[in-house]
A protein has these predicted regions:
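Glycine-rich, highly charged phosphate/nucleotide-binding loops
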Residues: 63-75
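N-terminal strand-loop element at the rim of the active site
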Residues: 2-64, 157
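Glycine-rich phosphate-binding loop signature in dinucleotide/nucleotide-binding domains
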Residues: 76-83
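Helix N-cap/beta->alpha junction signal
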Residues: 9, 37, 89-91, 151-153
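Short His-centered aromatic/hydrophobic patch
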Residues: 87-93, 112
Length: 157
């Protein structure tokens, strides 16, 4: 059985998802963690997970970069054939859920850790990003089998 954790930052995978990674491994899964670079990979691998580098511009708004990220995730999912994919934070949730659905992953989990700048700021830029993100979230969450809200108040948005 194979589980892929789609992470926007290596540090958050280790610091905030380390116990989850260990628990999933203890349940008999092979765990693969994606991240944007090789910084801190040894900590992730020390947990027993395998690491795959997939660059992501976490705060960028370039659709070409985002589609490139989604394509790289899709290719990874087709190659590794995971049983479960879990993405957390906006871009891993959006592009990971869509790619996992297209790749035929049986179980897709989206973890909304917080709404962030696009949904909390009131600038023109934030409002424009919010409009696009709302459409993308709707599509992505329709691809997910399970959606986890770390902050239940975010569910209303």
């Amino acid at each position: 059985m194979r589980f892929i954790l789609v992470s926007p930052k290596n540090r958050t995978a280790y610091n905030f998802r380390g116990d989850l990674i260990k628990r999933i491994i203890s349940c008999g899964y092979e765990v693969i963690v994606t991240g944007p670079n090789r910084v801190g990979v040894e900590k992730i691998e020390a947990l027993g997970a395998r690491f795959v580098e997939i660059p992501i511009n976490k705060n960028g708004v370039n659709p070409k970069e985002d589609l490139k990220y989604q394509k790289a995730l899709y290719e990874l999912f087709k190659k590794e054939k995971p049983d479960v994919v879990l993405g957390y934070t906006s871009k891993p949730v959006i592009y990971g859920s869509i790619a996992a659905k297209k790749a035929g992953v049986p179980h897709k989990v989206a973890m909304i850790t917080g709404l962030g700048y696009a949904f909390t700021a009131q600038t023109k830029k934030a409002k424009a990003i919010r409009a696009v993100m709302s459409v993308l979230y709707k599509k992505a969450l329709n691809c997910a089998d399970t959606v986890i809200f770390q902050n239940p108040d975010d569910r209303e948005q």
